[in-house]
């Protein structure tokens, strides 16, 4: 997962947007869990590229106390969550639903002309250890 985030940050960084990333205490997790989380991060970065007009974004992923904490921030134009048209909010609603299915929490803080901060907290689903005895 840490390598996937590094690749994603490098792949999506361009002349208009620099994506910084940091991972702390990240290990291998259940494969399905990793795929779901990777897809969520990818969708959020795509939203940043598509809507934010940001010049800098950051991805922070930390494992602490059996939880994964994900923070994605940008310095873009921000938005008023109440003013987002239903069709434009579908991606966010789907992400929220996926996170809740993973028994996690999702929050967005966005301010016009300051940027957006997204926080996700998920219980860790570790790779199963096989016991042959």
Task: Pin down the residues of each PLM region.
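Coiled-coil dimerization/phosphotransfer module
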Residues: 1-133
């Amino acid at each position: 997962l840490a390598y996937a985030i590094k690749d994603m940050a490098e792949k999506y960084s361009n002349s208009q947007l620099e994506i910084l990333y940091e991972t702390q205490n990240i290990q291998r997790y259940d494969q399905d869990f990793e795929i779901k989380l990777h897809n969520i991060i990818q969708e959020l970065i795509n939203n940043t590229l598509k809507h934010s007009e940001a010049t800098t974004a950051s991805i922070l992923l930390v494992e602490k106390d059996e939880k994964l904490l994900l923070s994605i921030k940008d310095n873009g134009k921000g938005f008023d969550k109440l003013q987002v048209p239903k069709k434009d909010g579908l991606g966010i609603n789907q992400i929220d639903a996926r996170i809740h299915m993973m028994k996690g929490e999702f929050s967005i803080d966005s301010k016009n002309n300051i940027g957006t901060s997204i926080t996700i907290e998920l219980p860790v689903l570790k790779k199963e250890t096989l016991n042959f005895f």
